Amino acid sequence: MTIEKIYPIFTVRWLAVHGLAVPTVFFLGSISAMQFIQR
């Protein structure tokens, strides 16, 4: 029963981390690519 309580919290935390990390990596990658293309 304890595992069932922890599992949804871990899933929500995993989704939140990836939901924030993916756009951040894409944002930083696009900025570095634009600066690299400008030079």
From Swiss-Prot:
GO terms for biological process: photosynthetic electron transport chain. Its cofactor is heme b. InterPro entries: PSII_cyt_b559_bsu, PSII_cyt_b559_CS, PSII_cyt_b559_N. It holds the Pfam family Cytochrom_B559. With its partner (PsbE) binds heme. PSII binds additional chlorophylls, carotenoids and specific lipids. It is found in: Plastid, Chloroplast thylakoid membrane. GO terms for cellular component: chloroplast thylakoid membrane; photosystem II reaction center. It is a single-pass membrane protein. The keyword NAD does not apply. Coiled coil: none annotated. GO terms for molecular function: electron transfer activity; heme binding; iron ion binding. Belongs to the PsbE/PsbF family. Heterodimer of an alpha subunit and a beta subunit. PSII is composed of 1 copy each of membrane proteins PsbA, PsbB, PsbC, PsbD, PsbE, PsbF, PsbH, PsbI, PsbJ, PsbK, PsbL, PsbM, PsbT, PsbX, PsbY, PsbZ, Psb30/Ycf12, at least 3 peripheral proteins of the oxygen-evolving complex and a large number of cofactors. It forms dimeric complexes. This b-type cytochrome is tightly associated with the reaction center of photosystem II (PSII). PSII is a light-driven water:plastoquinone oxidoreductase that uses light energy to abstract electrons from H(2)O, generating O(2) and a proton gradient subsequently used for ATP formation. It consists of a core antenna complex that captures photons, and an electron transfer chain that converts photonic excitation into a charge separation. This is Cytochrome b559 subunit beta. It comes from Welwitschia mirabilis (Tree tumbo).
